């Protein structure tokens, strides 16, 4: 199954996340198919940038979103509006 989820980058105690499309059997940070955005919780307010066209494409071909990505999608839609 293909999933849209967060992959952790950054350094210790300074997380930075990429929003990636990956096979659900892969590890959290490895082997992703495509990077469609990023999430930086360390900025004030938190920064979310997401390519909604690519996200909708992957959802159209059967990808599932994680709970956190679902919440971040709502924030990204508000920022783009």
From Swiss-Prot:
One of its GO terms (biological process) is translation. GO terms for molecular function: structural constituent of ribosome. Belongs to the bacterial ribosomal protein bS16 family. One of its GO terms (cellular component) is cytoplasm. It holds the Pfam family Ribosomal_S16. InterPro entries: Ribosomal_bS16, Ribosomal_bS16_CS, Ribosomal_bS16_dom_sf. This is Small ribosomal subunit protein bS16. PANTHER family: 30S RIBOSOMAL PROTEIN S16, SMALL RIBOSOMAL SUBUNIT PROTEIN BS16M. Keywords: Ribonucleoprotein, Ribosomal protein. It comes from the Bacteria.
């Amino acid at each position: 199954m293909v999933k849209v989820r967060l992959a952790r980058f950054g350094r210790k105690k300074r997380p930075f996340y990429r929003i990636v499309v990956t096979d659900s059997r892969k590890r959290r940070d490895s082997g992703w198919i495509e990077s469609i955005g990023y999430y930086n919780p360390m900025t004030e307010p938190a920064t979310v940038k997401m390519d909604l066209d690519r996200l909708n494409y992957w959802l159209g071909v059967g990808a599932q979103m994680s709970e956190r990505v679902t919440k971040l999608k709502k924030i990204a839609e508000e920022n783009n509006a």
